[in-house]
Amino acid sequence: MENISNLNKIEFISSLNKIRVESSKLLPINNSFIRFDLLNLVMLHELEGEELSFKRLYSSVNHSDIGLRNHLMKLKDDGWISINESKKDARSKIITATDKLHRTYERLSEALRKNS
């Protein structure tokens, strides 16, 4: 960040704070980077049209397997994500975003645009 002016640094940090505040209002992250990372990863793979398997998930984030699994099951139970068999490989489970998560990301996007 050496070449970035202090004003740009302030704007950048302010943007990060807005993301954190708005995300905390709308998403079930409970101040957990694990949940924040999980939800973002699920949405990213879904929007890119890629399947997110458990194997890919575990290799994509730097959190403990047990912590990830506990948060995944809670997010599933609360209707934020679904876990189904892969159409490509019946041995694999695929994590996808529910309509609830899609709608919430739309609201989050709108809130961030309003506050920028």
Predicted regions and their residues:
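Amphipathic alpha-helical dimerization/coiled-coil segments
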Residues: 8, 20-23, 106-116
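A short secondary-structure junction motif
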Residues: 16-20, 45, 78
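Charged/polar positions within long, soluble alpha-helices
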Residues: 43, 73, 77-80, 106, ...
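N-terminal helix-turn-helix DNA-binding core of bacterial DNA-binding proteins
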Residues: 25-63
